[in-house]
Amino acid sequence: MYNEIPTNRPATPLLDSIDSPAELRALSEKQLPQLADELRAFLLYTVGQTGGHFGAGLGVVELTIALHYVYDTPEDRLVWDVGHQTYPHKILTSRRERMHSIRQGGGLSGFPKREESPYDTFGVGHSSTSISAAQGMAIGAKMAGTERKVAAIIGDGAMTAGMAFEALNHAAHTETDMLVVLNDNNMSISPNVGGLSTYLSKIWASKFYNSLREGSKQVLGKIPPAWEFARRTEEHFKGFMSPGTLFEEMGFNYVGPINGHDLGDLVRCLRNLREIKGPKLLHVITQKGKGFEPAELDPVGYHALNKIEPKKAAIGAVDAPKKVKFQDVFGQWLCDMAARDDKLIGITPAMCEGSGMVGFAQQFPERFYDVAIAEQHAVTLAAGMACEGQKPVVAIYSTFLQRAYDQLIHDVALQNLDVTFAIDRAGLVGEDGPTHSGSFDISYLRCIPQMLLATPSDENECRQLLYTAYQYPGPAAVRYPRGTGAGAVIEQAMTALPIGKGVVRREGKQVALLCFGTLLPTAAQVAEKLGASLCDMRFVKPLDSELIARMAASHSLLVTLEENALAGGAGSAVSEYLNSQGIAIPLLQLGFADEFIDHNSQKQQLAQQGLDAKGIETAITQHLAMMAAATKAVAG
């Protein structure tokens, strides 16, 4: 048991001898506990050096070893859900010496990635996709005539999503030969653990029991009343002893729960289950943060870890004041607004901490709904509340709102219901990479009729635009980025800002910068250097068409800036407006290129997209030069 993160690389002689699962499978079972200890120590050390997802990986060390020990990976397919727990998997699959690069530019991804390794069979970052993908692989293997085995590893939190149950239902219906490993770390499903349960699990996973079970089906199946009696007897016996009745009813052969940290039991169960045909589910109980006491005591707080920086001391040094994160700006606004309006209800799909809702949940528990990983349900739940005169606020990451797009259109916007969406992690998210990037929300929201979409430029404007959106009698969204802003002073008073109206922050000549969002401080540097005008647009929908027309009439070039894909983004909205009015003026649109942006620091990602001060200035000066050359060519 560790109480501190090791700062020196631990001795891991057995782990160092393993470069692939093939070498792991050459070990004796007696060596596996030592390997688990070394793997856990190495994981603690590397995440301390780099930062990254932490608790989930510590909890599946033994499970990961057992899976690669029993299954012939990569020929057999292991499909991981979400991916937070795959650091041990990466270490065992030829990437141990690259773990220092995880979540860094040009380094390993923090999630499974097909381009990175043949052992990463399915790219992931969002939850509840593993069972569907694994079923597809199993069907594909069968169609190809191979004997390949497929296993999906899914957590109890991810199992709450509807997609997981859709896949379970279909896999059972098609009798797909696959294994689902339910990694239960007590975040959702209550475990049924004990000596009798472990004993029954071993029996239910044994070849004898399953051959007897299948043989009985064949024999008694010819005598319908007898088979029905036997089936009901087994159902009642197992339902009394275990939580697996639901999965058995769906058509899965359920085994468990078993201790997910007992390598002997894991290996024995997996070996037996690998030989059993049809859909199977193994329920394992694990502890998130296993082996690191602070993480065991606080699994939520240690879900992810920042890089451990060396301590520095300076005489007379004064710590710089900490900037407020946008998620905390939202959290404080939510509490303040709830104190004013008892109709406010806060909803989040399993993102209470990340969305800044802990304070609200504590102060207003009767008005707080964490619906688990169920984005579709969250949005339609809010729609139903709005039908009854309540004022729901849905706090959700940009990337996860994509999963509820039909509900957004059909259940909220089509009925013009009064639902406020606080869209966190809009724009680039840094080390979490493309699976979590909020690159598309402007594009997919602004095309929805009756939707209001606001893009605050700083912390105070975020607070005021949240209040503005809340007052709007229809669907309204406020998007804001991960992390902190410029450090603006936040006014406690809440003021509804004029809808669809921007603000001129600097009057200049020739070039007008139209900024949508928190690139404003960077744009201000460029505007100052180029003598350009600068507008804080505030709203993508409705656009401040009057301000755009005024800038077009008094400048030679308009430049739009946004942290969103250029395709269909705010720049496209400006272009559409200019075209509709017959306003002929050069327009330079700056935003994200038509690509998925790989993991790196947010600063580096912005620079790579040309959205730092240097990149913006260069793009503008080059465009002006191109315009001058074109004018000269026409004149000549």
Swiss-Prot record:
Reaction(s) the record says it catalyses: D-glyceraldehyde 3-phosphate + pyruvate + H(+) = 1-deoxy-D-xylulose 5-phosphate + CO2
Family, similarity comment: Belongs to the transketolase family. DXPS subfamily.
InterPro entries linked: Dxylulose-5-P_synthase (IPR005477), THDP-binding (IPR029061), Transketo_C/PFOR_II (IPR009014), Transketolase-like_Pyr-bd (IPR005475), Transketolase_BS (IPR020826), Transketolase_C (IPR033248)
Subunit note: Homodimer.
Name of the molecule in the record: 1-deoxy-D-xylulose-5-phosphate synthase
Physiological role: Catalyzes the acyloin condensation reaction between C atoms 2 and 3 of pyruvate and glyceraldehyde 3-phosphate to yield 1-deoxy-D-xylulose-5-phosphate (DXP).
Gene Ontology biological process: 1-deoxy-D-xylulose 5-phosphate biosynthetic process; isopentenyl diphosphate biosynthetic process, methylerythritol 4-phosphate pathway; terpenoid biosynthetic process; thiamine biosynthetic process
Organism: Cellvibrio japonicus (strain Ueda107)
Cofactor binding mode and count: Binds 1 Mg(2+) ion per subunit.
